[in-house]
């Protein structure tokens, strides 16, 4: 099986459509379907900050749950939106407010449909995907070699948030260790979460979050070819979001 792994979309539907077309997908049925049966895999954070979060929920639900032709691993923004839809007390900030505004503008029957689709998508998707006979791991923020195969709370925190130290940057965002430098495994770990200006290859890991929602690019990784394909963002560039990893 061949995969096209897509970085953090954050509601950037136009960039997602542009990227999938560049990757050879047809949109004849309003969904990206590849003529050679390649499958899309999403590293999470499909919503928040960008203009079309609900459209992305509907597309990813259709591909993953209904047609079963794609893979999705949830990100930290996905986790927060899931908790919002469950009625938990979450702070509506850091991008969630854009998704909530879209959601609240809908009639109640459409709200219920979006809520049900996202809850189903989240609950039926694993924390990370182990593909190609364990040669490929797709997850949101990365995973340590000794965590592969585990699903406990410590692993959940790692794959959603990265290797956080407990400290904070001046803007309140968490300080993260550079776990990829310590990775010694042979499985390819393809992830996102931390915006980088260019895809970052370290050992057998690749960070493909190139900050589409911050004016960078939306990036896909063609596997097993290990070929990078990107499209430019239509949004303003926000340089402070591309912080070096500690």
UniProtKB/Swiss-Prot annotation:
Its cofactor is Ni(2+). InterPro entries: Ap4A_hydrolase (IPR050126), Bis(5'-nucleosyl)-tetraP_PrpE (IPR023937), Calcineurin-like_PHP_ApaH (IPR004843), Metallo-depent_PP-like (IPR029052), MPP_PrpE-like (IPR041780). Keywords: GTP-binding, Hydrolase, Nickel, Nucleotide-binding. It comes from the Bacteria. It is an enzyme of class 3 (hydrolase). One of its GO terms (cellular component) is cytoplasm. GO terms for molecular function: bis(5'-nucleosyl)-tetraphosphatase (asymmetrical) activity; GTP binding; nickel cation binding; phosphatase activity. It catalyses: P(1),P(4)-bis(5'-guanosyl) tetraphosphate + H2O = GMP + GTP + 2 H(+). Belongs to the PrpE family. Asymmetrically hydrolyzes Ap4p to yield AMP and ATP. HAMAP family: PrpE. This is Bis(5'-nucleosyl)-tetraphosphatase PrpE [asymmetrical]. The gene is prpE.
